[in-house]
């Protein structure tokens, strides 16, 4: 038989082994705690930063915007050593916060740029009318800006969730206890010095990909709209 031929019979045994040997449910719990918190945090901070950059004039505004753009040139690998030392000093290793904080910081620049481009396309007249009706800045942001920014917020949510969910580098460094490993970190446990169970690995990869596919399918309509907002000015 060829290595590429279909199996003689199909079985769910590898999936059963994945749940029994790898403690997948616990790993899912930590993954969703980390990725969900990162996604919500990035959406909140990025929308607030974009609102300030697009609606207010202040000294050093251009420098702040340039700093946000420039920060995209520095990958997480370049800053992981000082971040790791900081987490050690704060006694946060093997804590979800040790992964959440660096991931929020790593996603914030891109998310702010996406949100800024979208907010620049929102007419100021809508906000001015709300101010004339007696609304304060917090109500304008919550009632007008946030609902209109749903496409860009969906884009930010998708990219933040996927990046956090698949980020093996930060998770592996900050999470030292195997019982607290997120789902993507479990793949390393399948490969060992004694060999690799490819059936178990294939089943585990399928289990890991399922949440990613669900998130993408639910929010895919807003990706292009959110990324291209503000690209054309009329």
Give names to the regions the model predicted:
Residues 1-234:
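A structural signal for multi-pass alpha-helical bundles of membrane permease subunits
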């Amino acid at each position: 038989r060829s290595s590429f031929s279909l199996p003689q019979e199909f079985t769910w045994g590898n999936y059963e082994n994945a749940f029994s040997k790898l403690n997948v449910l616990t790993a899912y719990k930590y993954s969703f705690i980390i990725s969900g918190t990162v996604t919500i945090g990035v959406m909140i901070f990025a929308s607030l930063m974009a609102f300030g950059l697009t609606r207010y004039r202040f000294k050093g505004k251009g420098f702040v915007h340039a700093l946000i753009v420039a920060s995209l040139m520095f990958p997480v690998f370049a800053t992981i050593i000082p971040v790791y030392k900081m987490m050690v000093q704060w006694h946060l290793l093997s804590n979800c916060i040790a992964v959440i904080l660096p991931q929020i910081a790593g996603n914030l620049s891109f998310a702010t740029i996406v949100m800024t481009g979208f907010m620049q396309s929102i007419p100021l007249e809508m906000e001015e009318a709300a101010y004339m009706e007696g609304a304060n800045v917090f109500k304008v942001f919550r009632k007008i800006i946030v609902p209109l920014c749903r496409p860009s917020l969906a884009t930010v949510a998708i990219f933040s969730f996927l990046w956090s969910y698949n980020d093996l580098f930060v998770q592996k460094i900050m999470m030292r206890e195997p019982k607290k490993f997120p789902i993507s970190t479990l793949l390393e446990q399948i490969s060992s010095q004694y060999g690799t169970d490819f059936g178990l690995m294939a089943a585990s990869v399928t289990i890991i990909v399922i949440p990613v596919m669900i998130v993408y399918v639910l929010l895919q309509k807003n990706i292009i709209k959110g990324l291209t907002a503000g690209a054309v000015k009329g």
